[in-house]
Amino acid sequence: MDVKIELSSYVRVLKLASTPSWNEFSQIGLIAGAGIVFVGFLGFLIFAIMTLLPGGV
């Protein structure tokens, strides 16, 4: 395993990477938040259906 080659590839990737703008950052935050809310709502919906059905948990 050649550590020097691996480190140079990591450095190359870090040089290409850039800090996201505020618009990109807020858009990513909104999309991630919407996904979290959706998964939570889906879990609550499944829980509510299982509770209302006879023989549910």
Swiss-Prot record:
Subcellular location per the Swiss-Prot or TrEMBL entry: Cell membrane
GO biological process: intracellular protein transmembrane transport; protein secretion; protein targeting
GO molecular function annotations of the record: protein transmembrane transporter activity
GO cellular component: plasma membrane
Keyword Transport in annotation: yes
InterPro entries (alphabetical): Prot_translocase_SecE_dom_sf, Translocase_Sec61-g, Translocase_SecE/Sec61-g
Keyword list, A-Z: Cell membrane, Membrane, Protein transport, Translocation, Transmembrane, Transmembrane helix, Transport
Keyword Lyase: no
Chain ranges passing through the membrane: 30-50
Membrane topology, as annotated: Single-pass membrane protein
Subunit structure: Component of the Sec protein translocase complex. Heterotrimer consisting of SecY (alpha), SecG (beta) and SecE (gamma) subunits. The heterotrimers can form oligomers, although 1 heterotrimer is thought to be able to translocate proteins. Interacts with the ribosome. May interact with SecDF, and other proteins may be involved.
Protein family per UniProt: Belongs to the SecE/SEC61-gamma family.
Function: Essential subunit of the Sec protein translocation channel SecYEG. Clamps together the 2 halves of SecY. May contact the channel plug during translocation.
Protein name: Protein translocase subunit SecE
Species this chain originates from: Haloquadratum walsbyi (strain DSM 16790 / HBSQ001)
Protein encoded by which gene: secE
